From Swiss-Prot:
GO MF term set: structural molecule activity
Signal peptide positions on this chain: 1-32
Location relative to the cell: Periplasm; Bacterial flagellum basal body
Subunit comment: The basal body constitutes a major portion of the flagellar organelle and consists of four rings (L,P,S, and M) mounted on a central rod.
Family to which this protein belongs: Belongs to the FlgI family.
Keyword tags: Bacterial flagellum, Periplasm, Signal
Domain of life: Bacteria
GO BP term (any one): bacterial-type flagellum-dependent cell motility
Annotated protein name in UniProt: Flagellar P-ring protein
Organism for this UniProt entry: Rhodospirillum rubrum (strain ATCC 11170 / ATH 1.1.1 / DSM 467 / LMG 4362 / NCIMB 8255 / S1)
The keyword tRNA processing is annotated on this UniProt entry: no
Annotated GO CC locations: bacterial-type flagellum basal body, distal rod, P ring; outer membrane-bounded periplasmic space
Functional description taken from the UniProt entry: Assembles around the rod to form the L-ring and probably protects the motor/basal body from shearing forces during rotation.
Keyword presence, Signal: yes
Amino acid sequence: MTAPAGFLPRVGRLIAVALTAVFLLAPTGAEAASRIKDLADFEGVRDNILVGYGLVVGLKGTGDKLDDVTFTKESLIGMLERLGVNTREGKLDPDNVAAVMVTGTLPPFARQGSRIDVTISALGTAKSLAGGTLMVTPLIGADGEVYAVAQGQAQIGGYAVQGQSASVQKGVPTSGRIPNGALVEAEVPFNLSAMESVKISLRNPDFTTARRIAQAINAFLGTELARPLDPGTVLVAVTAGYEGNAVALLTDIEQLLVEPDTVARVVIDEATGTIVIGEKVRINTVAIAQGNLTIRVTETPQVSQPAPFSQGGQTAVVPRTNIQVDEGKDNKLTVVNGGVNLQDLVNSLNALGVGPRDMISILQAIKSAGAMQAEIQVM
């Protein structure tokens, strides 16, 4: 799907992030509908966060400095002593060990013996985890119980190289992943077949969308078994035909098509100059003028030296400052008629010849003037 010819000729990043190729050709009816599984989650069917503390060994001189990071040293001593190695009598100062936090996500219905990915992140002064191996690390859940055990070779996406007078770094060498690095040891108890009702949690709570989901489910089942509890929750009773077989009910429900209702919203990321304008954004009639003021200050100091063989002369640096002020072109007022759609709004702003960052200020000013019927969300 492509944008209309001549659309957004100069706005740069706004071309990609305004999503105009989708919003301007706004679909209707079934084309705008989404599956319930893409709009909501079933309560209880969720991931669980796991975390653990471990040691990465086998680093090439890029590990923690044990004199500075005492918890790494104590952890190493404890691990070696559990393996029967006496370390108390000698000096222990390796540079190939690093303490790390290990995190992972236990997916719903993960069974004992299955594997999950884990992420490792350095805690101490380690410069890189490249080439390291994570030693056996228990991963605990929010209840303090161990659900998985992690171990394996770390995959690092970055690197760091340092010499006596220069260094080069790419990516984040102190963080990495271990694919299938954790073995599930305990399952999260969840009896799906015994459920008498199912709660559907909307990812973007909305009264209208919740009501439409309930209506779609009732129309499919042929009876009033679904009702919205609030903008983010729809309760569905397990009907007689699905008793003891909630999996079949959830499978049928998640495939139903519902057209979600969205809030008119403009999302702005001032740090990157990113603007995302929703399809439903409308504005009242407003006149806009935008002026650019650029001030350039350039320092070009000159060195003044005394004449040859002169007495008492000294070399001096004479400052020289050049200031240029560019007020830009005299932009006239641009009138934006009320009730325009996204294309008309962006085209009117483009007529001012401004970039994304200036457009952020303009959109905020339109909102302050009460002419924009939309919510502005600043990231």
